[in-house]
Regions:
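Hinge/lid segment of periplasmic solute-binding proteins
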Residues: 93-118, 186-235, 260, 275-276, ...
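Long, aromatic- and glycine/proline-rich binding clefts that accommodate carbohydrate-like moieties
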Residues: 99, 106-113, 218-219, 379-383, ...
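Extracytoplasmic "Venus flytrap"/periplasmic binding protein-like
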Residues: 144-214, 218-220, 242-254, 349, ...
Length: 511
């Protein structure tokens, strides 16, 4: 299998400090205490055509398969961190992969532990990561699994947009297609897809004891383990620390007003040598990623969490104010093309040296620190800003792995998931790709903490999540209505007119 190395997302409710981590870092790796409810089972609305403006690709990563990336949303909210860690799950401690972590490179994943060769000769079709370095790590681990077990893994990158991925999976399941064996599942999807997924409990139940119990609960529907935790996620602010120093800015912005001021100062100074330099980039396209970003804007400004207590709450003065402010960023501190950006577009703009600030997920950290990255050693990660008097927030999420009920190679597929979700592979992915682990023993590994130093900066961030619990099977339609409304505002429409209409539309969906 060829490795084309080069160049992903969002868990559910109330975060609590876990495992043997330091209290600071552990708060960032909070698990969810309540499982999310099913996301909608109807296909997502069609996406509007993208505007032409795109950032130049960053030097470091290889091109990704689709035009843009997606985070796939978060499930129910993990609230602010608690001061002391909870005990890690009661189970035999997983083997420590720390000693081997330093030997990992993208093309050198760990071997399969006690490989099961009973299914040698089988072929497993894996719809894996389509964003950032994730596809490269999928290819490398697939190659290693094939080498150790004799099972061939056909890696197919999922669409980079989570919205498009959801629709693609629906088509597979509606046709009961055998052309899908292992699939990546966003944290808000287990309930929606549960009838089409294999119960992993009989084969992988013991392995779940290694993972944060709240995340396992999110992957359990009706007493069945329908997916296995793969990695976690949350929204963060990337900033050019060298440029802050250059322009005598003492610290990254803590408020949205400060972000505007700092971005303007840096832009004015940099445009002389780089006319295309911009201040701030994010995921502005009309897709699930914009729901994550806009939820952060609202929740960090007293504007609510989209749906609360069964009611859509987006039409309020605080939401109007922050979205009016965001609208003002377009064409000033942000490029007009940001209204079409997904994860990789934003990362490419930032990593190529063309932006001062970026909202993105942890995966971008490892890519930005690669040897061929123009911004290696020049950036850091902080909490996203908030409005004055409000707390910083970050949409939290992650992905899991599942086996289709219509797969013809279910046992081989389960063995592949056992490998991908093992402590050894989670350590490899955390060290090489800055994927946030779901296993406490991995999160507390010094090698992982060294590879993800930014986590210590994020302990005080309140975790928020998309309202999948509140909206149940209507979530996908609710999110679509919300992100389309926000994208309309980005493209010039008045928040005072758009939000009442969107709130009425969402409320009708809720009944």
């Amino acid at each position: 299998m060829d490795l084309d190395l080069g160049v992903r997302r969002p868990y559910s409710r109330r975060g609590f400090l876990l495992g043997a981590l330091s209290a600071t870092t552990a708060g960032v790796l909070a698990a969810c205490s309540q499982p999310s409810q099913p996301a909608a089972t109807s296909a997502p609305a069609a996406q509007p055509p993208a505007a032409p403006t795109k950032p130049a690709a960053a030097a470091s990563p290889a091109a990704s398969p689709a035009a843009a990336a997606s985070p796939a949303a978060a499930a129910s909210p993990a609230a602010s961190p608690v001061a002391k860690p909870a005990a890690s799950p009661a189970a035999a401690a997983p083997p420590s992969p720390a000693a081997a972590a330093g030997q990992f490179s993208a093309s050198n994943p760990p071997p399969v532990q006690n490989p099961n060769k009973s299914f040698a000769g089988a072929t497993v079709i894996y719809y894996g990561d389509g964003v950032g370095i994730g596809n490269d790590l999928d290819k490398a681990t697939a190659q290693r699994f094939e080498q150790d077990t004799g099972v061939k893994i056909n890696v197919i990158p999922r669409p980079q947009s989570a919205t498009d991925t959801f629709a693609q999976y629906q088509r597979f399941f509606q046709g009961q297609s055998a052309d899908l064996d292992v699939l990546m599942v966003d944290v808000i999807w287990p309930g929606a897809f549960a009838p089409n997924l294999v119960d992993l409990g009989p084969k992988l139940g013991d392995a779940t004891k290694n993972h944060y119990p709240g995340i396992v609960a999110n992957d359990t529907v009706g007493g069945k383990l329908v997916s296995m935790p793969f990695f976690s996620d949350f929204g963060t602010l990337y900033y050019r620390k060298d440029l802050l120093q250059k322009y005598n800015i003492s610290a990254p912005p803590k408020t949205w007003d400060e972000l505007e001021q700092q971005a303007t100062t840096i832009m004015n100074g940099e445009k002389g040598s780089n006319p295309n330099f911009t201040g701030f980039v994010w995921q502005g396209n009309a897709y699930e990623g914009l729901t994550c970003d806009a939820l952060e804007w609202l929740a960090s400004s007293g504007g609510g969490k989209i749906v609360e207590n069964g009611k859509c709450t987006i039409n309020n003065p605080q939401a109007v104010a922050i979205l009016t402010k965001m609208k003002g960023w377009i064409g000033t501190i942000a490029p007009r093309g940001v209204t079409t950006y997904q994860e990789e577009d934003a990362r490419n703009a930032f990593q190529s040296g063309g932006a001062a600030f970026m909202r993105n997920w942890p995966y971008a950290y490892a890519l930005g620190q690669k040897d061929d990255s123009p911004v290696k050693g020049k950036f850091d990660v902080a909490a996203l800003p908030a409005s004055s008097g409000q707390k910083p927030v970050g949409t939290i999420g992650g992905w899991a792995l599942a086996v289709s009920k219509y797969s013809k190679n279910q046992d081989a597929s389960i063995e592949f998931i056992r490998y991908l979700t093992s402590p050894e592979v989670q350590t490899y992915r955390a060290v090489v790709g800055s994927f946030v682990p779901t296993i406490p023993a991995v999160a507390s590994d010094p090698n992982v903490q060294q590879a993800q130093p930014f986590l210590a900066n994020l302990a005080d961030v309140e975790r928020v999540a998309r309202p999948s619990s509140e909206t149940g099977e209507n979530y996908n339609q609710v999110s679509t209505a919300f992100f389309q409304a926000v994208n309309n505002i980005e493209n010039g429409q008045d928040p005072g007119s758009v939000l009442p209409q969107a709130q009425n539309q969402i409320q009708r969906l809720l009944g």
